[in-house]
Amino acid sequence: MEAGAWEPQTFEVFRRFLQPDRSYIDLGAWIGPTVLYGAALSRCVHAVEPDPVAFAELDRNVRANPGLCEKIHLHPFGIGPESGPLHLYAGGLYYAGHSEFGDSMSGMLAAPDVPGQPCHKARGVDMEHFLHMYARKDCNFIKMDIEGGEYAVIPGLWRRLWRWGPPTLCVSFHAPEIARRESLVRACIEELLLCYPRFYAAADTKAVALEKLADAVHDWGDDAPGSPWRKLEALLGAGLVATREEW
């Protein structure tokens, strides 16, 4: 997949923050578009993907790139709030009748009020343990696109990564249903404000006043175009870069 044809803002973030002598972690590696691109820019990449269908395709794609495969370490499990069993739901928060594993939408949070949503029991590892085991010396960047799982692994937990910097984080948020929207999004924002001094929009690389944008949302159910919530959603959905570095 050529850079520029798929989420070009992600590749721009990679070009800015990945370093040839540092490793990075790709959470939600899917079938590997960011993994292969990032491997060319970093010392090595730890690709984490708990969806068994996506992981099989990821493995094939990595093997098809012999010039990069030695720099790519594949992990067939997910990052969870704690180490142990992890339930992965086809379609995640946005399950529909056609959702299936491997379509990039699998997530730790199930869709509300959807009985019979397909579920896969995977292995989960907490972020602190993963860093200690696999990337404790040289990780400077984490990409996170885990279809709603951000609401489980960031709040109250990201602060534990202080001994690693914490690494710069590029996270794509996925809007939950209205009933949980404010509580989940605010919990993540508050944790990131505690951990990082600088925030940038992946879409245009501009600095953002994250706390101010969140405080401007008074009606979290207002989905009208241009509403404060929709502006925040657009920023978070396209990718938020949280870092201690200047862009």
Please identify what each model-predicted range represents:
Residues M1-W247:
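Phosphate/nucleotide-binding beta-alpha loop and adjacent structural elements of enzyme active sites
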